[in-house]
Amino acid sequence: MFAMNTAYHSIVKILVNSDGSAGTGVAFTTGLNAPDGVAVDGDDNLWVVANQEDEIVVVDPTGKVIAKRGNFNGLTDDGSIDGLLFAASLSFSPNGKVLYVTNLALYLPFAGPANRR
């Protein structure tokens, strides 16, 4: 079992006791900028959202970062978001071939001072 320790930029592996209860937590990997959502692929790699870096980090079963994907590329000509902007969680499709990512970025073309009556 894994816990994202967002404030301390790390992932904690929680060992499971023989009776199924939670055991001791040990540092699994550190140095990720605000790890948040996590999904596990068919090779037991963790795919972790590092939302303050606007990227997805792939961590192998030993805790080593083996890949980084995505980033924030700015705005397109029409003002919409290009890339990840504070992604939060992710999940693989049942067959493991598609990765779904929630992106907290909002396209708000009307954003500006509120007019109150």
Residue ranges and their predicted role:
Residues 8, 22, 53, 115-116:
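A detector of repeated loop/turn-to-beta-strand junctions in beta-rich toroidal repeat architectures
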Residues 23-30, 65-80:
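A short beta-strand motif characteristic of beta-propeller blades
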Residues 14-21, 61-64:
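Short loop/turn segments immediately following beta-strands, especially the blade-tip
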Residues 5-7, 51-52, 61, 104-106:
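Short loop/turn segments immediately following the C-termini of beta-strands
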Residues 2-15:
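Oxyanion-binding "anion nests"
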Residues 1, 29-47, 53, 76-97:
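Beta-rich, blade/repeat-based domains predominating
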Residues 89-117:
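Blade-level signature of beta-propeller repeat domains, shared across WD40, Kelch, NHL, RCC1
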Residues 9-12, 54-57, 107-109:
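Structural signal for beta-propeller blades
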